[in-house]
Amino acid sequence: MAFFQTNIIFARDRSKNGKILFSISSLFYLVQMKNQYFKIFILLIICQYGLLGSLSAKSKKDSILTRIFTYPEKIKTLQAPDTVSYAYMKSSFHINKRNLLLMAVPTMYAMAHVGSRRYLEESYNKVTFLPNGKYQIDKILSLSSAGSHRLSFPAMLHYLTPNIYDVTLINENVLSPFHRQNKIYYKYTIEESADSLLKLHFKPRLKNTLLVTGEAEVDARSGKISTIQLTGEYDMIFYRLSIQMGNHGVQSLTPQNCSLTSRFLFFGNDVRTHYTIAYHLPKILPNISEANQNFQLMEQIRPEPLTSYEKMVYSELLKDKRSEEKDTTALDSVATPPKVNFVKSVLWDMIGENIFNDIHQDFGPNKAGSLRIDPILNPLYMEYSPSQGFYYNFNIRGGYHFSENSNIWLQLKGGYSFRLHQFSFWIPLIYYFDIRHNGFISSGISGGRRIQNGNLVNELRIATNNNRVWDNLNLYEFNDSFWDCYANYDFTPKIGFQAGFVFHRRTALNKVGFELINKPSVYTSLAPKFQVHYRPWGYQGPTLMACYEKSIKKLAGTNTPYTRWEFDGQYILPLHNVQSLSMRVGTGFYTDRSHNDYFVDFENFRQTFLPNGWNDEWSGEFELLESSLYNQSNYYVRANFTYESPFLVLAWTPLIGHFIERERLYLSALRVKNANPYLELGYAIKTRFLSIGAFMSNMNGKTKDFGFKFGFELFRRW
């Protein structure tokens, strides 16, 4: 009876809370039951205790997670963050294996051919904390055992500037386990520790490159995280990251110290790195431009002395430095200039590095100017689309900041289509005179774009009694070059206005047929253009656009009159967990045109000849649409929808799911002349290696085409 008496007391106590009710008469009845029922009753009581304990543990875990998720909100309302700080970073590199393929990896060219396999770098940096929670790191002083060669491995800087309370932990890709939206992707367990501290263990619910495994030391009362240990693998980098957060106030939201160990594996290449960085240091050096290879200055700011191993790595560089400082001239001797190895210093070092690596150079006072050139010959910049086949892109861009509200930018974007044997380019020059109001003047030229005009071919047929010989002479294709110049100004975040002009010169690829019927083979137009932009929710919401363009015949010697209207609306709706819904709807039409001499060429409905990766024109475009349909109809109505998610379908599958970074679903619809309607469905994935899309089209109720599109994504974020 002792057991039953205990449970009677328990039942009475619990009945006060209205959760568990037992009657004394029921218990006496159970005593008289057979032994097997008695055992069942005991088992139920034990399960009851286990369930209550499990619910209690889950409730505690949820309470701790809630405090962690809401901790930044409590801190940010108390104090504004310091916008500028200083940091010391030390990095070491150990090249276990390397081959020629390492040269194709951005910023790894020097490691591929410099003699030593061990390197050490140090830097003193100015850190600017941006309003969006990101960091901007500007190097003030640097010291490297590799001398003038670049070894900084800039892709690793993203791992050293983690934003643990944001949705994405590292470079807008790795999902943070300390954000509420990502809770569904992680499993959490709590381990009690001394005082009010506890350890929070986390691991992903699925094996994916966007998720991490690790533990954090958390204050149970406030939810403040003091230290973090995590491991993961992203972009072929296996990493182990240790983070010590700041102690008080806003600094507790950012790292105080980070230690990173990583391993990069790529087709037989094996590079190990180790980084340490200390934030929130005082300003030690004066305002000087970036200084390189200054041992004395680095010794002044180094927070801790070098280890014996690090001194050994530096020893060769120190030896060369001291030998350079010695006075080698003598009164009775003539200095002999050292021999220059032309193959190594010119072909290998200077030309080779610039071919395989991107060039990024700052210039001017306070690094106000910058120039960046993509690798000239890098197969990783090759892409493929059903309409253009294989094509290669390159990009050159530079700019200069006059002030916080004024700058100027120049860009050259080019590409070559191997199927079309066609080179296209676009060169815009943009001067921002009022950045706060998006005020700028833009002037750009473009060439190499192909456009079609079937009406002129029809006129040739009529003039020659429907002779079909013209069909095989490719007379309907023209090479379109244009120059536009316009000014833009946003009066408010909701309303903007744009005015300028557009000049087109369209030249027939085959001029013979036009000469036979005394028709010009070159068509030019000069059109004033006006645009109005309306953003009902400001810059963060949708954008609605209305455009009016009118070309006047014989204006500046032109011969192609037309009047064109276009209306367009675009919006990318951000959803939870880095998901998004991209929407675009629009229409356009011609209201005034000549009989045959005009060209159907819309600004917001045209074939793209310079695509560039997953984030450029992979949404809001028609992948399988025939080129001729862009230029046949004097009107169009379009709608494009794209849903993007990191974990949609394939990400949940074994093996292959680990490499999936993004997935997309496409739905596009179009109504033009001869296509009523045109529908296109698609599905695409993005991995560290490739972005691959499969598309299917339907025109006028019949299945038309099926095709693929892919592009190399390898090292695109480096």
Predicted feature locations:
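Residues that define the transmembrane beta-barrel architecture of outer-membrane proteins
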Residues: 388-392, 421-425, 479-483, 520-528, ...
